[in-house]
Amino acid sequence: MKNVVIFLIKLYQRYISPMKPRSCRFYPTCSQYSIEAISKYGLLKGGIMSIWRILRCNPFNPGGYDPVK
């Protein structure tokens, strides 16, 4: 299941993300962060980390360097 989710994120990165203006305030991007978090911590914990990261990616947060720890 983990590999299916990562595959779907990679499809998003390849086909949908290039059509949208850059909007992620973080490095690595939220989608790349999600791949790394799910790969390292599994679908449950990595998924929660990904959701929390996406919720923080907004105009009220300065963003910056935020790697998966």
Swiss-Prot record:
Entry keyword set: Cell membrane, Membrane
Protein name per the record: Putative membrane protein insertion efficiency factor
One term under GO cellular component: plasma membrane
Organism, scientific name: Thermoanaerobacter pseudethanolicus (strain ATCC 33223 / 39E)
Family the UniProt entry places it in: Belongs to the UPF0161 family.
Cited Pfam families: YidD
Domain of life: Bacteria
Membrane protein topology class: Peripheral membrane protein
Function, in words: Could be involved in insertion of integral membrane proteins into the membrane.
Subcellular compartments: Cell membrane
